[in-house]
């Protein structure tokens, strides 16, 4: 094949990935024109709809997109990939790699990363609510007589969206890219039409209007910043979804279609307001002629459902990562596609999200009321991403500290400005994502610390495996036919389940495997590096299986690899899996306060069973109980 053909294929692949990325990565930020400008000129802010104010706000929107999306995320943050993977937990894992595990900075970076992940969930319950609701509210413009149906229709759409999750979205997901391309082309065309009617709006490109607006209104302008940040909702997805599509396709989509379309639409809305300030009641839908209003409502609703789907899938992926990294208890994870590795479904997360989202929709009743709650989760995550990226630049990339200080300083001023402006909205609704984030942060930190204490207690009371096996082989118990697999969290200690089996049954299987799963701080582990097998003699094997934080442990696949390496065969129905069922008992021992220990014990009790998590046949499992005092 010629170099020209290779180049053509690469180009085609890049374009295909870019279109696919548009359907997943840019749904959230792509639907922000539905409510952003309307919220900026909310009557509660008291900003007059004068030409200078309109130009000033549009200028702020424009430069926010350029600086935060176009420069910070696309040019800088997306460079900080963890073996190709992005997202706040991947960035945290990367930033922790060169640090001393016992240093304070390590604890701070870990806490920041976990809090950033928790704030994502705060964002994940608001995005579907505000996006779908704002789209359906277009009925108030298209067919005012149906305005009383906005809330019921929103609820029905959201319930249907979460109901279909268990069946997977791989089939309809192929349509997401083309539909979102149509969406961006449509909003760009609507913007261009009105820009042509009021070309004066183009002067908002000049940052003078942004600075003039800020200096003229000062305090009010700072409040407006809390609404301006709504144009950036979903910017974090550019980085978080990098592992699915790669940096190049996302950059191509951002610069060629997404950012130009967003800018054109915001400028079009600004032009409409210059022509008719009364259009502020719903500037997005009033961009369309009356005959196109209803089709635009339908397209908007589909686009917001796609945006919501991206957030929901992101919540599943983040939960899976957090489980593998040890910050969240085991949960049942179902794979909804045999072909697409990343297509997963987490039932607990799905139904909790739906419950909270429905409560939000019913409680807030309109997208206007909900807008105040939106920005704070986004800006908090932006600040955390900037700080973690700074650590990576200095510690991992070894960049000049002065250069990093200059770059990060500019980004932090912008991020903290937006975050501070959103703190003013805590009383109006900002308490919601903050409360969700704080509660989840407490639970995740409690789980992480509790597991650390359990490991310490287990290690202190544990028996080293190597000398134990030597003694066992010197004075072997009665051997029985078949294979026994002992799942253990520490490959240097004797599994408690083995001690119980020897104590009560006084037998050892002719083939005994001690299997440990280890999660590394990279997203994926190469197949040839995954499984190591140590032959301890006389049919005893120590197996260590390493997985990345984006992977799900697979007992069956590990056994197949062990069989390949050692020339064995395994019959699942002739194999027994021995597990230790730990019962955590809160005490007044040093570690955590007794009430946190009780919370941890409750989480531990309600974690998914290892049989469900590791997909082990339940009828082949022997569980032996053990108590651990913490």
Curated annotation (Swiss-Prot):
<feature type="transmembrane region" description="Helical">
    <location>
        <begin position="255"/>
        <end position="275"/>
    </location>
</feature>
<dbReference type="Pfam" id="PF22776">
    <property type="entry name" value="K_trans_C"/>
</dbReference>
<dbReference type="InterPro" id="IPR003855">
    <property type="entry name" value="K+_transporter"/>
</dbReference>
<dbReference type="GO" id="GO:0005886">
    <property type="term" value="C:plasma membrane"/>
</dbReference>
<keyword id="KW-0472">Membrane</keyword>
<feature type="transmembrane region" description="Helical">
    <location>
        <begin position="218"/>
        <end position="238"/>
    </location>
</feature>
<dbReference type="InterPro" id="IPR053951">
    <property type="entry name" value="K_trans_N"/>
</dbReference>
<feature type="transmembrane region" description="Helical">
    <location>
        <begin position="144"/>
        <end position="164"/>
    </location>
</feature>
<keyword id="KW-0812">Transmembrane</keyword>
<keyword id="KW-0997">Cell inner membrane</keyword>
<keyword id="KW-0633">Potassium transport</keyword>
<dbReference type="GO" id="GO:0015293">
    <property type="term" value="F:symporter activity"/>
</dbReference>
<feature type="transmembrane region" description="Helical">
    <location>
        <begin position="344"/>
        <end position="364"/>
    </location>
</feature>
<dbReference type="Pfam" id="PF02705">
    <property type="entry name" value="K_trans"/>
</dbReference>
<feature type="transmembrane region" description="Helical">
    <location>
        <begin position="105"/>
        <end position="125"/>
    </location>
</feature>
<feature type="transmembrane region" description="Helical">
    <location>
        <begin position="283"/>
        <end position="303"/>
    </location>
</feature>
<keyword id="KW-0769">Symport</keyword>
<comment type="similarity">
    <text>Belongs to the HAK/KUP transporter (TC 2.A.72) family.</text>
</comment>
<protein>
    <recommendedName>
        <fullName>Probable potassium transport system protein Kup</fullName>
    </recommendedName>
</protein>
<comment type="function">
    <text>Transport of potassium into the cell. Likely operates as a K(+):H(+) symporter.</text>
</comment>
<feature type="transmembrane region" description="Helical">
    <location>
        <begin position="374"/>
        <end position="394"/>
    </location>
</feature>
<feature type="transmembrane region" description="Helical">
    <location>
        <begin position="428"/>
        <end position="448"/>
    </location>
</feature>
<keyword id="KW-1003">Cell membrane</keyword>
<feature type="transmembrane region" description="Helical">
    <location>
        <begin position="402"/>
        <end position="422"/>
    </location>
</feature>
<dbReference type="InterPro" id="IPR023051">
    <property type="entry name" value="Kup"/>
</dbReference>
<feature type="transmembrane region" description="Helical">
    <location>
        <begin position="51"/>
        <end position="71"/>
    </location>
</feature>
<feature type="transmembrane region" description="Helical">
    <location>
        <begin position="17"/>
        <end position="37"/>
    </location>
</feature>
<keyword id="KW-0630">Potassium</keyword>
<feature type="transmembrane region" description="Helical">
    <location>
        <begin position="175"/>
        <end position="195"/>
    </location>
</feature>
<keyword id="KW-0813">Transport</keyword>
<keyword id="KW-0406">Ion transport</keyword>
<dbReference type="InterPro" id="IPR053952">
    <property type="entry name" value="K_trans_C"/>
</dbReference>
<dbReference type="GO" id="GO:0015079">
    <property type="term" value="F:potassium ion transmembrane transporter activity"/>
</dbReference>
<keyword id="KW-1133">Transmembrane helix</keyword>
